[in-house]
C-alpha cells in the first residue's frame, strides 16, 4: 500500500515486544467485562449507578457538579441533604431521586453522618428538631456539624428557616447555641433519671424558643 517496509517492520516488532509482557488479550477481555457490567448498571439502575459514582467522588466538588449535570441530562432529580432521608453517602429514595450524602456536607465528618443514619434506622425518623437533638449523640454531631446541617438544608424537613438557626434571643444568644445547650441538658437529665432508684422515664427540660 505504498508504506515503507522498514517502518512496518519496526511497528510490528514493537507490537510483538509489547505483547510479550502486556497480556493484551486477557487485559482487553477483563476490561470489556467491566465495561459491560457498568453499562448494564447504568442502563438498568441509572439512579443507583450515578449515586455510587457521586459517593466515590464526594470530596471532588468539580466532579460532583459534572455528575449532577449528567443526572439532569438523564432526567434524574438530585436533591439536597435531609437528615430523615439521606444516607452517609449519596443514595436513592423511594421516588428514584438521588439524595445528597450527609458525609459530603462541608464540615460534617463520617462519624457524624453515620451516627445520624444509625439512630434513624434504629428508632425511626426524627419527628422534629428537638427530637433530633434529644436523640443524637452530641459527641459525634457537635456544634459545627449542626451548623453545617442547618446551612446545607439538612434540617429543612423540620420547617424552620435556615436563617432562624442563627437568630438571637433577647439575651443575645444564638438559637443554635441554645439548641446545643438544650440537647446537653436533656441528655444529662435522661441519663440521671435512668440511673436513679426510681428509674423515671420522663425528662422535663424546656425547649428554647425558635427566633421569628
How would you describe each model-predicted region?
Residues 1-212:
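Noncatalytic, beta-rich nucleic-acid-contacting surfaces in large DNA/RNA-processing enzymes
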Amino acid at each position: 500500500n505504498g508504506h515503507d517496509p522498514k517502518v512496518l517492520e519496526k511497528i510490528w516488532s514493537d507490537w510483538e515486544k509489547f505483547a510479550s509482557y502486556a497480556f493484551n488479550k486477557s487485559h482487553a477481555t477483563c476490561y470489556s467485562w467491566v465495561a459491560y457490567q457498568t453499562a448494564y448498571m447504568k442502563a438498568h439502575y441509572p439512579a443507583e449507578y450515578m449515586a455510587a459514582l457521586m459517593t466515590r467522588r464526594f470530596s471532588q466538588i468539580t466532579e460532583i457538579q459534572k455528575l449532577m449535570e449528567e443526572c439532569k441530562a438523564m432526567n434524574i432529580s438530585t436533591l439536597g441533604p435531609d437528615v430523615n432521608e439521606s444516607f452517609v453517602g449519596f443514595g436513592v429514595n423511594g421516588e428514584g431521586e438521588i439524595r445528597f450524602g450527609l458525609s459530603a456536607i462541608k464540615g460534617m465528618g463520617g462519624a457524624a453522618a453515620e451516627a445520624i443514619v444509625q439512630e434513624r434506622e434504629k428508632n425511626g425518623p426524627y419527628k422534629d428538631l428537638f427530637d433530633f437533638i434529644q436523640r443524637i449523640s452530641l459527641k459525634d454531631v457537635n456544634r459545627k456539624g449542626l451548623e453545617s446541617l442547618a446551612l446545607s438544608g439538612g434540617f429543612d424537613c423540620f420547617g424552620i428557616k435556615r436563617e432562624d438557626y442563627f437568630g438571637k434571643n433577647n439575651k443575645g444568644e444564638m438559637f443554635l447555641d441554645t439548641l446545643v445547650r438544650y440537647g446537653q441538658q436533656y441528655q444529662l437529665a435522661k441519663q440521671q433519671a435512668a440511673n436513679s432508684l426510681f428509674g423515671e422515664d420522663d425528662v422535663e427540660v424546656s425547649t428554647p424558643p425558635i427566633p421569628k
